[in-house]
């Protein structure tokens, strides 16, 4: 959904966007700015139920259960709308998974962007193949040594 001035009004944050923010990586400022706009009700941010699971398990593996719970609790306090599994989202996610080389969780996250006609904010190379189906904001990828 777009504003009258042509700017996007609806966004979906991928797990990588949240991790960028939590770990203060390049692009964290972009995520923070979007969250501030959502708080001021200038935009709407959706986050897939799959994102909550991804944040939990990735953080659990790297930093332990306590930090995983802390991050999910913080996400629950943000001005975002959690997109739960629905029949319509399931069909869209299933179609994406069947036709693209994409993980199960990323299929749900991308389906959320398709369903809400939203711009997906991410830094996950898997989403590059979907640029004909969704609008994206690509955050800077991690630099490798």
Q: How would you name each of these model-derived features?
A:
Residues 39, 76, 114:
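Anion (oxyanion) recognition and catalysis
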Residues 58-61, 79:
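Helix-loop "lid/cap" segments that line or gate small-molecule binding pockets
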Residues 1-10, 110-145:
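Acidic, PIN/NYN-like endoribonuclease modules and their adjacent C-terminal/linker elements
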Residues 18-19, 52, 127-128:
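A generic structural signal for short hydrophobic patches within well-formed alpha-helices
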Residues 81-121:
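Active-site neighborhoods of divalent-metal-dependent phosphate/nucleic-acid chemistry enzymes
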Residues 1-47, 60-73, 143-145:
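Short, well-structured N-terminal submotif of metal-dependent ribonuclease cores
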